[in-house]
C-alpha cells in the first residue's frame, strides 16, 4: 500500500482485508507464506570454502606451510621421503577444519541466544490479544503499542492515547513525535510529519496506541533505507583482546629468538651450504611452532560459547560476550524490587473506602484486560482487575457502561494515570497512583455516598492507613475521581489531575521469591553488595529490605526526594550508607549507578521500563527483564533474565567467575606447556642436539594439550567460588601469581623432558654421554615424556592453589581427555607406519617405565609448591 496516511483507518483496514479485531490465525499463516517473515535482509554469510580459506591466513598456519615448503625442498635435495611434509600439511588441514567447525558452533550458539531474546509484540488474533515474535507479523495484523515498545513494522494508527514515538533512526530527529489518528492531506508528506503512521525502527516513549500493519520486512521504510543490513561482527571480550596482544608480543619475541638461533646454528656449523641453511631454518621453525599456543584461541572461544549456553539454560541470556568477564568482577547489584526480588504476582488483600466505587475506579483506570482465566497485563493492573471481578464487577461490563474517551497515561514522574469515561449523566475521571501523590491533588473525599471536604485531620488519617499497609510490605495504590458535565478540551495531566475526590486505598501483596533470601546471603558471602530500588513507599521498602536481609535498619534506606537534595559529591560520600532506595524515579537510578562507578565499583543494574534504558546503559552490566521488560531495555542490556529473578543474577555471577577461572586454568596449562617446549628447543639447540621436530611439537600442542585444555574449561566451580571477594577488573591475565606459575612449571617440564632425552640417548649407546645432533631414541623418549608430563600436568591445573586431591568432585571430561591423549600418544609410538613417519624408534617397557616415572614427578612437585604458596598466603594475612 502507498500513502496510507491519506486514508482513514477504516479504508486502510478494508484495503488490507483486515478489521479492528485483527486477523484470524489462518489468515495470518496464509499471509506469512506470501510475504515472508518480518525481517530485514542480512548480509550473506561466508561459505564453508571462504571460512576455510580465512583459517589458512592464520599466522601460525602460514608458518607451518612455510615449514612444509622448506621440508619439501630439503627432502627433494636429499632424496628422502616426503612423510614429514605430508604430516605438516595434514596438521594444517585439520587445524583449519577444526577452526571452521568451532567458528560455526560458536556462531550457532550466538544465534540460539539471539532467538531467545527475539523481539516480541502484542497483536490481536482471532479477536484475542496474544504475544508473538515480531518476525511473524504480516500486513493486516493489528498490533497494540505502549511506552517502551519498539515498533515492529510499518503501520497506520487506529488509536492513539497521548502516544509519542521517537523516530530518530529514520528521521534523525531525536524529539518524540506526538501521534494522532486523523488522516493527512497532501501527496508527499515527509516521513517525519506522518503523525498517523508508525514505522519499524522507532520506539514508543509515552502513551499507548493501536495500529494495523501496512508493510513488513524489506517493504518497510527501514527496509528501503537499509537495503542490506550488514552483519554485525561478533565482539571480542577484553580477555580475548588481551590474548591477541599476548600472541602478537610472543610472535615478536619468538621471531627474535628464531633469528638468534638461526644465526647461532650457522656460526656453530661453520658452513653456509643450502642443506645447512635449510636444516637450521627448520630448527628455528621448531622453536616458532613450540612458542605458539595453537589451541589457546579455540579453547577460549569454546569455553565462552559453552558458558553462555549454560547460562541461558539457567535463565541468564548473555547478549554481549563482554558481560561474561565483567560478571566475575561484580561488586554491587542494584535490583528493582518488583520482579527480581518478588514474584510479580500481585493480589489485593486490603482496601479502604467504598468497595464498589474503588473497584470500579481501579478496573477502569487500567490497561489490563480480563480474559476467561483471569486478567492479563502488567501484574499490578491485573491484580486490580481481578479484585474488581471478585466483587462481581467485570471489566468488559464496566467498559460497556462507561466507555473510555480520554486519558493521561502513567509516567514515572507523576506516579499516576487518569482516564475519562462517558456516563449517563456526563463524564467521570478516574485517577489511580501513589497514595501521597494522588492525595496531594485531592480537595474532597467520598464516604457513605457523600462528598465531603478533605480536612487535614482526614488527610492525616488516610496517610496513617497507607503507612499501616506499607509496614506490612504491601504495595499501596490510591484511587480518586472527578466529575465533568462535558468532555474536557484539554486533557494534559496538569489540567486533569487537580481538585480530585479521594475514593480509597488498595493494598496488594507481592510475595517475595523464596529463593531470593538465600541469593542475598550468597551475595554478601561473595563480597557483593545487594541494593534494592523501588518506587514503593519508604515503609514498604524498609519492611521488604529487612525481610530479605538487604538492610537491618531503616537508616539504611533513603527516598528519591532525599537524593534530589544531594549533590553528586555528597551522594558519592553517602552512597555506601544506603542499600534500599524508595520512591525512586528512573533518573535517580542513573545517579546511583554513577555514584558507585565513581567509587570504582563494578555495578550491575536491572531495569524493565523504557525510562530504565539510561541507567542500564550506564551500568557495567545492564540487566534487562525478559518477561516484564520493554524492547528498549532488552536491546540495551548486556544480559536478559528470562525469568526476571534476582537469584538468576547471582547464579550468573557465579557462572561468570567459574568461566573466568577455567579460562585462566586453560591459559596456565597451555602457556606452561609452550614454555617448556620453547625452553627445551632453545637449550637443546645451545647444547648441540635436536630435542623435537616441528611435527612432534605440533602433535603435542594440538592433540596432547588441546583436549585437556578444553576439559579444564568445563571444570566445575571451586568450593570458594562464591566465598571470595570479586577480582579486580583491572587485573591482567597473569595476576595472582599466574605468570610465576607458568614460568616455574614450564622450567620443571623442560628439565624433566631434557633429562628423559639424555637417558634415552644413553640407553641407545649403552653408556653416558651428552647427545649431539639427532638421537632417535632420545627424541622418542623426549616426545613420550613431554606428552605424559603435560597430560599429568593438566590434572594439576584443576586448581591454581588448592591441592587437586582436596577438590570435592571429579572432572570426568578431563579424565576422558587425559586417557584419550595418552592413547593417541601411544598409538603414534606403537603403530609402525605412524612411528616411522614421525621418526620414532620402538619403545621398550623399561623406557615406558622411565618416562612414566619422570613425567609423574610434575604432580608431587607442583603440589609441594602449592602447599608452600598456601602457607605463605596464610602468613601474609
What are these regions (language model features)?
Residues 83, 774-781:
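Membrane-interface starts of transmembrane alpha-helices
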Amino acid at each position: 500500500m502507498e500513502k496510507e496516511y491519506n486514508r482513514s483507518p477504516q479504508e486502510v483496514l478494508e484495503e488490507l482485508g483486515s478489521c479492528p479485531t485483527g486477523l484470524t490465525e489462518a489468515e495470518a499463516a496464509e499471509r506469512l507464506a506470501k510475504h515472508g517473515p518480518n525481517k530485514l535482509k542480512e548480509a550473506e554469510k561466508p561459505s564453508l570454502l571462504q571460512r576455510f580459506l580465512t583459517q589458512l591466513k592464520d599466522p601460525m598456519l602460514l608458518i607451518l606451510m612455510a615449514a612444509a615448503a622448506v621440508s619439501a625442498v630439503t627432502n627433494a635435495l636429499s632424496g628422502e621421503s616426503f612423510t614429514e611434509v605430508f604430516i605438516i600439511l595434514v596438521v594444517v588441514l585439520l587445524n583449519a577444519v577444526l577452526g571452521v567447525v568451532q567458528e560455526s558452533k560458536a556462531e550457532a550458539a550466538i544465534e540460539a541466544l539471539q532467538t531467545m531474546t527475539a523481539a516480541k509484540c502484542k497483536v490481536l488474533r482471532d479477536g484475542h490479544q496474544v504475544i508473538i515474535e515480531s518476525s511473524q507479523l504480516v500486513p493486516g495484523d493489528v498490533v497494540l503499542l505502549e511506552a517502551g515498545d519498539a515498533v515492529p513494522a510499518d503501520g497506520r494508527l487506529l488509536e492513539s492515547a497521548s502516544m509519542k514515538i521517537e523516530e530518530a533512526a529514520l528521521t534523525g530527529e531525536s524529539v518524540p513525535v506526538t501521534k494522532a489518528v486523523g488522516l493527512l492531506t497532501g501527496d508527499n508528506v515527509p516521513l517525519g510529519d506522518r503523525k498517523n503512521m508508525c514505522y519499524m525502527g522507532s520506539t514508543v516513549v509515552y502513551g499507548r496506541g493501536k495500529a494495523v500493519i501496512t508493510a513488513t520486512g524489506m517493504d518497510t521504510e527501514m527496509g528501503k533505507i537499509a537495503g542490506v543490513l550488514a552483519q554485525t561482527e561478533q565482539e571480542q571480550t577484553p580477555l580475548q583482546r588481551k590474548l591477541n596482544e599476548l600472541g602478537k608480543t610472543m610472535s615478536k619475541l619468538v621471531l627474535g629468538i628464531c633469528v638468534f638461533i638461526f644465526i647461532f646454528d650457522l656460526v656453530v656449523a661453520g658452513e653456509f651450504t643450502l642443506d645447512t641453511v635449510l636444516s637450521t631454518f627448520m630448527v628455528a621453525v621448531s622453536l616458532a611452532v613450540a612458542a605458539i599456543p595453537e589451541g589457546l584461541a579455540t579453547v577460549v572461544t569454546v569455553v565462552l560459547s559453552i558458558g553462555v549456553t549454560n547460562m541461558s539454560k539457567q535463565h541468564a541470556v548473555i547478549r554481549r560476550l563482554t558481560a561474561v568477564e565483567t560478571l566475575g568482577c561484580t561488586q554491587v547489584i542494584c535490583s528493582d524490587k518488583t520482579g527480581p526480588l518478588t514474584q510479580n504476582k500481585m493480589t489485593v488483600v486490603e482496601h479502604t473506602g467504598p468497595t464498589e466505587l474503588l473497584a470500579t475506579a481501579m478496573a477502569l483506570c487500567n490497561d489490563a484486560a480480563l480474559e476467561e482465566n483471569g486478567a492479563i497485563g502488567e501484574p499490578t493492573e491485573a491484580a486490580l482487575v481481578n479484585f474488581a471481578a471478585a466483587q462481581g464487577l467485570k471489566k468488559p461490563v464496566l467498559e460497556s457502561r462507561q466507555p473510555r474517551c480520554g486519558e493521561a497515561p502513567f509516567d514515572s514522574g507523576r506516579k499516576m494515570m487518569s482516564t475519562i469515561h462517558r456516563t449517563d449523566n456526563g463524564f467521570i475521571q478516574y485517577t489511580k497512583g501513589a497514595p501521597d501523590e494522588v492525595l496531594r491533588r485531592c480537595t474532597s473525599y467520598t464516604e457513605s455516598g457523600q462528598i465531603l471536604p478533605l480536612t487535614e485531620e482526614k488527610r492525616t488519617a488516610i496517610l496513617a492507613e497507607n503507612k499501616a499497609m506499607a509496614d506490612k510490605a504491601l504495595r499501596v495504590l490510591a484511587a480518586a475521581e472527578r466529575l465533568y458535565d462535558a468532555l474536557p478540551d484539554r486533557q494534559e495531566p496538569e489540567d486533569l489531575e487537580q481538585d480530585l475526590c479521594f475514593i480509597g486505598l488498595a493494598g496488594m501483596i507481592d510475595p517475595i521469591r523464596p529463593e531470593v533470601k538465600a541469593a542475598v546471603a550468597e551475595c554478601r558471602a561473595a563480597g557483593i553488595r545487594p541494593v534494592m530500588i523501588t518506587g514503593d513507599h519508604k515503609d514498604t521498602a524498609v519492611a521488604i529490605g529487612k525481610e530479605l536481609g538487604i538492610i537491618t535498619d531503616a537508616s539504611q534506606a533513603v527516598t528519591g526526594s532525599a537524593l534530589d537534595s544531594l549533590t553528586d559529591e555528597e551522594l558519592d560520600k553517602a552512597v555506601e550508607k544506603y542499600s534500599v532506595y524508595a520512591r525512586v524515579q528512573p533518573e535517580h537510578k542513573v545517579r546511583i549507578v554513577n555514584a558507585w562507578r565513581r567509587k570504582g565499583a563494578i555495578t550491575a543494574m536491572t531495569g524493565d521500563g523504557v525510562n530504565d534504558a539510561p541507567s542500564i546503559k550506564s551500568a557495567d552490566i545492564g540487566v534487562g527483564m525478559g518477561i516484564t521488560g520493554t524492547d528498549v531495555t532488552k536491546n540495551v542490556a548486556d544480559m536478559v533474565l528470562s525469568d526476571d529473578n534476582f537469584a538468576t543474577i547471582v547464579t550468573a555471577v557465579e557462572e561468570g567467575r567459574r568461566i573466568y577461572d577455567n579460562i585462566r586454568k586453560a591459559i596456565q596449562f597451555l602457556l606452561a606447556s609452550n614454555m617448556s617446549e620453547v625452553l627445551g628447543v632453545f637449550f637443546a639447540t645451545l647444547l648441540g642436539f635436536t630435542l623435537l621436530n616441528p611435527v612432534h611439537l605440533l602433535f603435542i600442542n594440538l592433540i596432547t594439550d588441546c583436549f585437556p585444555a578444553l576439559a579444564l574449561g568445563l571444570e566445575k566451580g571451586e568450593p570458594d567460588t562464591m566465598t571470595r571477594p570479586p577480582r579486580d577488573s583491572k587485573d591482567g591475565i597473569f595476576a595472582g601469581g599466574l605468570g610465576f606459575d607458568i614460568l616455574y612449571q614450564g622450567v620443571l617440564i623442560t628439565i624433566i623432558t631434557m633429562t628423559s632425552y639424555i637417558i634415552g640417548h644413553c640407553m641407545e649407546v649403552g653408556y653416558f654421554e651428552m647427545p649431539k645432533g639427532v638421537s632417535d631414541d632420545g627424541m622418542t623418549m623426549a616426545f613420550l615424556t613431554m606428552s605424559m608430563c603435560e597430560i599429568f600436568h593438566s590434572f594439576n591445573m584443576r586448581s591454581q592453589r588448592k591441592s587437586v586431591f582436596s577438590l570435592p568432585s571429579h572432572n570426568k571430561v578431563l579424565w576422558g581427555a587425559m586417557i584419550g591423549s595418552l592413547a593417541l600418544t601411544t598409538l603414534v609410538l606403537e603403530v609402525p607406519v605412524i612411528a616411522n613417519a614421525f621418526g620414532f624408534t620402538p619403545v621398550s617397557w623399561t623406557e615406558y617405565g622411565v618416562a612414566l616415572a619422570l613425567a609423574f614427578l610434575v604432580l608431587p612437585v607442583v603440589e609441594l609448591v602449592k602447599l608452600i604458596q598456601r602457607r605463605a598466603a596464610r602468613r601474609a594475612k
